[in-house]
Amino acid sequence: MKETDLIIIGAGPGGYKAAAYAAKHGLKVVIFEGAEVGGTCLNVGCIPTKTYVHSGSFTEARERMTQVVPQLRSGVESILSHPNISLVREKGVFVDANTVGDYTAKNIIIATGSTSKLIPVPGIDSPEVVDSTGLLNLETLPKRLCIIGAGVIGMEFASVFNRFGSEVTVIEFLKECLPAFDSDIAKRLRKQMEKAGITFNMSSGVKAIVSEASPSGKRTKVLFEQKGKELSVEADVILVATGRKPNTEGLNLEAAGITLAPNSTIPVDENFRILPNSPLKGEDTSQKVSPLRGDLEGSVFAIGDVNGRQMLAHAAEVQGIHVVNRILGIEDNIRFEVMPAAIFTNPEAACVGPSEDQLKEAGTPFECHKSFYRANGKALAMGETEGMVKLCCEPKEGRLLSAHIFGAHAADLVQEVTAYITLGATLRQLRETVHIHPTLSEVLIEVN
């Protein structure tokens, strides 16, 4: 066996960022990757979808994707060429709690990401059914696209393919789209997408996917129930966007003494170290803390989608950096509860902190302040007047608690508020910060 300081399984955003950070601080790192470096985000996720979002046609989007993805992948490979990093191009498999493949180390990070989760309904294995990767691999634009699931993935693809010219229908089990977003923002976005021609069937449960012969050829339908009525929609392609599940198969976790939680995630403590005891069936491990041991040297960690905490590429990155800091004995001030998120529809939506509904449910006193894009000079000049900002803050001191934005460049705007919340700043301090005129950022200081 070859000894090293740190083993990382998975070269996605969390894995390769942790490797680069550890190498910079003098650790010898071995990182395993059985597929392309960069993970889902770079190869078949956030980056390819953004080339679609910012392309004028389906053909242009595919061409740009084939240029952008290899370029960024080459950048990741360059990062991993650091003299302190050894990239092993094979899947990392545990031999024991300190050994992966032919390498042994005191510290191991599992950063294997997640994969699409399909719903168990008849016909789900039909050739017309694809996940997000399959949709990105389509060579021709579908005339009719049915999307099952109105989460971030489903809504982004609905927006993009509608703009490309597909007839898009979305079927969602819940009463509103984007359950992780503020309900007010989610509703406004859905209404705007409906105006663009997308059909939404909310509070609807998919029952089956069936195909039948017809004089014009094969017909495929999605059968669903809505308020007791049996309905159906025909589609040429059916995207299943009903969530993701952690990638844990084939890692031989049992050899390392690791037991999955009931939801198939790897349970971790507040430092993302894998909990030493097997979780009980139905036990909530999200807040469970295992005893710390100094700087945590001699531990196995799980970061990113595989621990189920926050399934976001940037969450995986900061979790990886935090783990390396703990291994090195370095304290940091990363606030994992202040985690911004965005959806790149047209218009965009973004958020950071608890929604208005969550604040009410928690009994947290708060004030809500709003402003609208239609009153912003830059938005008017751009022709992007559909949008709103909602800032929640404490009633007395005015400390910022959350931000919820719907409109052009929402993902960029929310980042400023994220910084203020992280620093414990107030709404007054935000308002008293000078903003360039004319910019969309002025909507933040124009709240009532």
Give a label for each model feature.
Residues 46, 112-167, 171, 196-200, ...:
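Glycine-rich dinucleotide-binding loop and its adjacent helix/turn
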Residues 68-73, 137, 142-146, 152-212, ...:
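Rossmann-like dinucleotide-binding cores of NAD(P)H-dependent redox enzymes
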Residues 125-141, 232-277, 281-287, 291, ...:
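FAD-site-proximal beta/loop scaffold in flavoenzymes
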Residues 2-4, 40-102, 181-207, 356-358, ...:
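N-terminal Rossmann-like dinucleotide/flavin-binding domain of flavoprotein oxidoreductases
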Residues 1-12, 141-151:
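Beta1/beta-strand and adjacent pyrophosphate-binding region of the FAD-binding site
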Residues 27-33, 110, 166-172:
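Short beta-strand "acidic-cap" motif of Rossmann-like dinucleotide-binding folds
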Residues 2-4, 101-107, 228-237:
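Core beta-strand elements of the Rossmann-like FAD/NAD(P) dinucleotide-binding domain
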Residues 9-14, 18-35, 40, 47, ...:
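Flexible, glycine-rich terminal cap/loop adjacent to redox cofactors
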